[in-house]
């Protein structure tokens, strides 16, 4: 009886399910690409459907899907919108989860025509697969003289671009714009017009009329926000193109320059005059007339409000979110209207005295607008150059504010000057590192010294030349996020470097995924990246020491102590 029980225990422990319970971290728990992304197709004359069944915990990159016809003509393929995914190294990318159905219209296909489909995906656990290529055989299709009908693409979950600033900032910006030289002096006049020249209104009545005026103005701005966000939703893919991002960055920079006084940006004077006449025809003191006056006022942009309004409109177009677009502009208008409501109720005694400080407020908003092109360019030029741009902007803002504050004579301004100077010195650090090469030197000192190999023959030769030393082979690719995490966080750790001091370090860069790369991965039986292999002094791999997926420095150091031959 005891022998039977012992045999049963051995049988259970030998199965893959129970054996998986004893796998150490880093052992492969990932399925092959064909199981992670099950690909299928179905053709019915001119209509071809490509489908991917995506395993839970995995995703496909939208930008990595490519379709190339051979001896066939197809209509333009419109990829459905995905969901946003963000990582430290590549920023935001659109991805597909669960299931993707892609309809393709075949305009004409000769006998033997094919469709080459390339795609690539990753696992949430930080494991990426090389690009997969499938060949789809096409049935013969005779060209149809009629114009092909546009392909109806099923929409997946709408992506919402994550913007770096909350919509609530629009409220603060609106309040700040109210204190610029083009707006603040006009509030007493506007208050009188809204009340219809009546001085003996109750506080509640005056507040109600002013609130209605602000809501009319807010309605105009909200409508603008909805229209721009809807347009951004239609052109969301185009708005993420590097050339478009660079163009928008230039526009934002020009808008900021107008806030610095380099030129004046406003509606044509003839249009402003016409809108003003329409507003003057309305009857002040009545709710209906006041509402129309506010709605028209939202269209009359002064030189101080045109640039911020244009910047906010272009900014929310990046989101493609109509709720965010309308809400942002509503809060912006509400912020501009709050000082007007206070003046109407409490009178001019709440207004600060006009002076040069209003120009400084206008200049400060120019720097706020300048932050937007930096945010956009960061997606194109990468994190390192993005940090340098933020550094330059910080130095310009805090340095300029410090120089301006030197004109102040009040004692408490000395504390402000010290804070501004300290902020400028902190901001300049990335530029200092770049100028004097500090960052490069540090990186050079912390990187492992890998010997690059490309082919199976080069690997075998390197194993022979190791002369009895243990060997570690790191398989790397630019499209592998976890590979970059290994490089930045794990291989730079002093404990890891010390543990690998007597190990021959090899690295194969398979970014190109060419025939040699594919042959090497197949020879090593590698499903995807990151994968790190360990060989003993005789050139034999230790499969139990193989690492798939990211390990931090502490875990990897423990793995080296326990597993490395």
Swiss-Prot record:
Membrane topology, from the record: Multi-pass membrane protein
Signal peptide positions (record): 1-19
Spans through the membrane: 163-183, 208-228, 243-263, 296-316, 323-343, 365-385, 386-406
One GO term describing the cellular component: plasma membrane
Entry's Gene Ontology BP terms: cell redox homeostasis; cytochrome complex assembly
Keyword Repressor: no
Enzyme class: oxidoreductase
InterPro entries attached to this UniProt entry: Cyt_c_assmbl_TM_dom, DsbD_gamma, DsbDN, DsbDN_sf, Thiol_diS_interchange_DbsD, Thioredoxin-like_fold, Thioredoxin-like_sf, Thioredoxin_CS
Origin superkingdom: Bacteria
Alphabetical list of Gene3D superfamilies matching this protein: Glutaredoxin, Thiol:disulfide interchange protein DsbD, N-terminal domain
Catalytic activity: [protein]-dithiol + NAD(+) = [protein]-disulfide + NADH + H(+); [protein]-dithiol + NADP(+) = [protein]-disulfide + NADPH + H(+)
Residues of the Thioredoxin domain: 434-565
Cell membrane found in the keyword field: yes
GO terms of molecular function: electron transfer activity; protein-disulfide reductase [NAD(P)H] activity
Disulfide bridges in this chain: 122-128, 182-304, 480-483
EC number: 1.8.1.8
Keyword terms: Cell inner membrane, Cell membrane, Cytochrome c-type biogenesis, Disulfide bond, Electron transport, Membrane, NAD, Oxidoreductase, Redox-active center, Signal, Transmembrane, Transmembrane helix, Transport
Record localization: Cell inner membrane
Function: Required to facilitate the formation of correct disulfide bonds in some periplasmic proteins and for the assembly of the periplasmic c-type cytochromes. Acts by transferring electrons from cytoplasmic thioredoxin to the periplasm. This transfer involves a cascade of disulfide bond formation and reduction steps.
Family: Belongs to the thioredoxin family. DsbD subfamily.
Name the record gives this protein: Thiol:disulfide interchange protein DsbD
Species this chain originates from: Shigella dysenteriae serotype 1 (strain Sd197)
Gene: dsbD
